Regions:
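Bacterial N-terminal signal peptides
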Residues: 7-15
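Bacterial N-terminal signal peptides that target proteins for export
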Residues: 1-7
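Sec/Tat signal peptide C-region and signal peptidase I cleavage site
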Residues: 16-22
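Flexible loop/hinge segments at secondary-structure junctions
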Residues: 22-343
Length: 343
């Protein structure tokens, strides 16, 4: 037993320096929504700490990024995961099974799942029920036969349902299902009963998206969605609020339940698609790569994520004061998240 403990300690001591020997640059993967914020932080960080190199930021989507992040410890694996939703219990289990046992969770701000369209489009307001009936593969368990928005709601125009949105690897796709589609689905008495008896089937019916061409996966590239909307009147795009904010000359936001996606409505959570954004730090890499601490410190500065921070100019919505204080403490202490608290 003593030999095994000594051997394990030796492996740990050898493996961590090996990361630094192989690379000194920090590497982050994950959310396309968090990407522009992480990129801006990386640029500031590189100017402040030129000897540490410019952090490498990759836009892979939250789900795909989690798989890479949780695949192991060592120079081949990312140091940080950017996420547009919280880590799932299944992802924490994957991390733990691959030796990634200590991860720090840091909320960096807020964003909203925005519905955008060309400024020339007649659509201006949708309810969550409208969106569910238009996009669900089997709304309330029945095949989706709706071809136009008027089929969904007689008060809407008779234009074809054509929505550009994120793929299954995206945290924005998860948020679409959880925040926008599930509430009107669960409001149905039959679906509420199903949730108690068969949660997996309930989730499939409430969050499953149609595959007949009405919903088009646009990849992990919100800028591509912006281009599609500008070129195709009467289509709708699902993207992060920051991308809508940056393209207000071309696009307009669609109200959901009568609430426009704005800084104020997301900050107050009165907008149904408001959600927190996170970064996850692989603690086992921190000692070997000083650039990780420098990046995390820059990302959580009040001058970055506060109400007057430079990331607000990029479309980030500042989290409440108490949340920012917790995030700044987490960045300093790097206390690991309790995997058991994740769902």
């Amino acid at each position: 037993m003593r030999f095994k403990m000594l051997a394990a300690t030796a492996v740990a001591l050898i493996s961590i320096p090996a990361i630094a020997d192989a690379r000194s640059q920090m590497r982050a993967v994950g959310s396309s929504t968090v990407y522009p914020f992480a990129k801006a932080v990386a640029e500031r960080d590189a100017r402040a700490n030129p000897k540490l190199g410019t952090p490498v930021i990759e836009s892979t989507g939250t789900g795909a990024g989690m798989k890479l992040f949780c695949a192991g410890v060592g120079e081949r694996f990312p140091d940080i995961e950017n996420a547009s939703r919280r880590m799932k219990a299944s992802e924490a289990k994957l991390c733990a099974s691959n030796g990634v046992k200590q991860v720090t969770e840091i909320q960096v701000g807020l964003d909203g799942v925005a519905f955008a369209t060309s400024r020339a489009t007649g659509l201006s307001n949708l309810t969550q029920r409208d969106i569910y009936l238009a996009l669900a593969k089997t709304p309330f368990g029945k095949p989706n036969k709706s071809k136009t928005w008027k089929d969904v709601n007689g008060k809407l125009p008779a234009v074809p349902i054509r929505v550009y949105g994120p793929p299954t690897t995206s945290g924005t796709r998860d948020a679409l299902g959880e925040l926008i589609m599930t509430p009107p689905c669960e409001a149905n008495a039959g679906m509420a009963a199903m949730k108690k008896s068969d949660e997996a089937k309930f989730k499939a019916i409430c969050t499953g998206i149609r595959t007949d061409g009405a919903y088009v996966e646009a990849g992990e590239n919100d800028n591509l969605i912006v281009q599609k909307l500008a070129a195709n009147t009467d289509t709708i795009g699902i993207l992060g609020y920051s991308f809508l904010e940056e393209n207000v000359s071309k696009l307009k936001g669609i109200s959901v339940n009568g609430v426009q996606p704005t800084y104020q409505t997301i900050s107050s959570f009165s907008y149904p698609g408001a959600r927190p954004l996170y970064i996850y730090v692989k603690n086992a890499h921190v000692a070997a790569i000083p650039a990780i601490r420098a990046f995390v410190a820059e990302f959580t500065k009040e001058s970055a994520i506060g109400p007057k921070g430079y990331l607000i100019q990029h479309g980030l919505v500042a989290a409440p004061n108490n949340v920012r204080a917790r995030s700044q403490m987490a960045a300093r202490n790097l206390a690991p998240v309790n995997f058991a608290s994740l769902k």
